[in-house]
Amino acid sequence: CKIHYMKKVFISGISGYIAMHCAQQLLEKGYSINATVRDTKKIDPIKKALKDLSLDVSKIDFFEADLLSDQNWEDAMTGCEDVLHVASPYPLAQPKDENDLIKPAVEGTERVVSLALKQNVRKIVLTSSVAAISSGHTKKQFSEEDWSKVDEPIPAYPKSKALAEKKAWDLINKSNKKTKLTVINPAGVIGPSLTSEVSSTQLIISGLVNGKIPINLPIHIGYVDVRDVALAHVKALESTKSDGERIILSNTELWTKDVSKILRENGYNAPRFSASVAN
């Protein structure tokens, strides 16, 4: 069942790498957007990037809002039929205190989903990650039925994604509202950035090229193009078939040495030597 177009969608954290592509695709389809930014200095670069794609930025209303504060969230969501909750902190390094990452992720999700339920929005699409699915396990294959083991000593990022996503499902399942939830769980996200924002996976690839990662690390992950991730968000909004679903997005998994080989085949300098995996 397809849903009609031309309505207003709320996007949290529009300046982010994935969120910008979501905004592009929604504007191309004629949607209007209410968007949050944590820092208003990002508004002009966002507008410029979207104008450069010949998009009508007058269809975006911006609101300053922080994941850890109630201020402006309700105003930002008013009049929106659907919600894309994309904003979530991600680390460039493991934080000293895991709660620096977990608290804004969980509280931000609780804030957005609770408000969406209060305002009776039709649908929420939440950006999660395969990190919410696979961390802490010894097995090799995963499905949407799996959850990262948050009671095990796993890194802060997968714990933050799993706990935030669980909070969203708990709120939806305990509610008597008709609001539907779909969760998108992408693997390592790569592809062009519309602003200076990048993903942690992109940093690995750029590190292989610029010498900051001089040897192939024993990292084995799946990859997915950011434009496909954004498309999945839009399609989830427009189809009732995705209601109540978690959706993993991943292409073939690759070791870092395989990524380096692809880079070298395309004219880039990338490491030829690999670190061994400890037994």
Predicted features and spans:
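N-terminal Rossmann NAD(P)H-binding glycine-rich loop of SDR-like oxidoreductase domains
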Residues: 9-31, 36
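Conserved Rossmann-fold NAD(P)-dependent oxidoreductase catalytic core, especially the SDR/UDP-sugar
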Residues: 85, 89, 95-157
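Active-site Tyr-X1-5-Lys
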Residues: 152-181
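A conserved pocket-lining segment of Rossmann-fold NAD(P)-dependent short-chain dehydrogenase/reductase
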Residues: 94, 149-154, 195-196, 202-224
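NAD(P)H-binding glycine-rich loop region in Rossmannoid oxidoreductase-like domains
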Residues: 40-41, 50-107
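Mid/C-terminal beta-alpha module of Rossmann-like enzyme folds, strongest
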Residues: 223, 230-279
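Glycine/proline-rich active-site loop of Rossmann-fold NAD(P)-dependent oxidoreductases
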Residues: 177-179, 191-204, 236-247
